[in-house]
């Protein structure tokens, strides 16, 4: 039950240069409070990748987890789409 309360996101891998860690950029659409235009916001997350299986430009699903280091609070769930 508790696992379903964790946040899930889908994003693209922008860096895989670290050992067991990838950087995932997640895009969200937000309406501008004054002008009403839809703006794309990008947030980068450091994600734990135990087997180093995700590569750059892969589309991945990530899930919130306990703090694993100073910046890492997400873990890789699955690779949705491999890079071409």
UniProtKB/Swiss-Prot annotation:
Nucleus found in the keyword field: no
Coiled-coil stretches: none
Physiological role: One of the primary rRNA binding proteins, it binds specifically to the 5'-end of 16S ribosomal RNA.
Assembly mode: Part of the 30S ribosomal subunit.
Domain of life of the organism encoding this protein: Bacteria
Species annotation: Clostridium beijerinckii (strain ATCC 51743 / NCIMB 8052)
Protein name per its UniProtKB record: Small ribosomal subunit protein uS17
GO biological process: translation
Gene3D superfamilies: Nucleic acid-binding proteins
Gene for this chain: rpsQ
């Amino acid at each position: 039950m508790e696992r379903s309360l964790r946040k899930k996101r889908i994003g693209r891998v922008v860096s895989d240069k670290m050992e067991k860690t990838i950087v995932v950029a997640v895009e969200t659409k937000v309406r501008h409070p004054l002008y009403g235009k839809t703006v794309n916001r990008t947030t980068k997350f450091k994600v734990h990748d135990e087997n180093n299986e995700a590569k750059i430009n892969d589309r991945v699903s990530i899930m919130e987890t306990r703090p694993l280091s100073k910046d890492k609070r997400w873990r890789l769930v699955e690779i949705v789409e491999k890079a071409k």
